[in-house]
Amino acid sequence: MEIRFNPMKITGVGAFGDVRGRTAAGIRSVYFILCTGYYDGLSEDIRELDRKLSTDERCIYRRVTDLPVMGVREAAEYGEKWERLCRGESVIPTETEKALKEVCSIYRSLRKNINPTIEKNFAAVLMFYSDRLLGKMTCDSGKCPKLVCSGRIGLKEYLFFHMAALMGIDVMLLCPSGLPQLPEELERVYEHIRLGEC
């Protein structure tokens, strides 16, 4: 499946709730929005977005405020899963595998001189997040998957949400205190909306 990012201009939180990523002719339209700043009615607009998308039967909606913490047992389990994936075994859905490998490639290009253990640990965290947060959020379900994060975003977190967008999930990241430190080459993927002052 080919991904086309942000086919329509999104102007705010409410507009994200109104658009639906869709698939046509083998191309998936996906919205990946990064919002910075704050305005007086933002909290109310987020509550309204939650209400609207939670009750919309055409959507699979999830809002995240904190990413889960991976324990030692899970780290070993997902690390082994990554090693099996590298050997060519099919251990995760195809779209997830494709997105994971693309994001790991981005990570390698951004973090020079990483060794296989660091990459395995990074991939393990992404697979753990995916299992815990995305679950059945696929565009194969016939519904539009939408994910909103209103927590702290660093590079690792951003790359997880980037992976979700590559899987065909509409993603909106709310960063009221400002844009996280992201490399310039990632700017082509997301649309940045300034909601107000940081």
Q: Where are each of the predicted segments found?
A:
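Conserved N-terminal ligand/cofactor-binding loop architecture of enzyme catalytic domains
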Residues: M1-G14, T23-L126, E185-C198
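Short boundary motifs at domain starts and secondary-structure transition points
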Residues: F16-G26, L133-S141
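Short alpha-helical segments and helix-capping/turn motifs at coil-helix boundaries
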Residues: F16-V19, D45-E48, L155-F160
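Active-site and donor-binding regions of nucleotide-sugar-utilizing enzymes
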Residues: Y107-I193
